[in-house]
Amino acid sequence: MVNSSGHCSYYAAHMTGRSADAFLTIRAFGAIGNGLSYAIGVAAARPETQVVLIDGDGGFLMHAQELETIKRHGIKLLMIVMNDAAYGSEIHKLRVDGHDETGAAFGQTDLASVARGFGLGGVSFTNLEELDAAFEDFVSGKKAALWDFHISDQIASPVMRRLT
């Protein structure tokens, strides 16, 4: 599992049932936007291991063009994107301080369609009951897939709630 340093990284860091060497994160770096390129590198270095990226939509969109790299090199990577249509950390900070949040919100993007446009798998989830079928499709398939979870921008991580 690979995770970048955005707002959604809090939740990925608290997943159980994995060894420390199976969870790679760049939280110490402190900037979003590196998760996808990091996951590609891990998948290339560990071709025998199934790599899963968990990232936010803001960070993912900073390197979405790398979907072409994934397709060209035949990398089987599962990309899970928590899509709140915003830069999660920033929107919560702006709200607490009473500032205009339009600079942190950018509208809902259909990232599953973007992935399909690159010839990869793409699923937008509306409920968790769809997970089993998507999981079976990914496991039995030979190509990368992007799972686009449209989530609320109103929920802040416990860390963010303490900071704000």
What are these regions (language model features)?
Residues 1-48, 161:
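Active-site diphosphate/adenylate-binding microenvironment
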Residues 11-17, 64-66, 89-94, 157-162:
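Short acidic, glycine/serine/threonine-rich loops at helix termini
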Residues 95, 131, 135-164:
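Glycine/aspartate-rich loop-and-adjacent alpha/beta segment that forms the canonical ThDP
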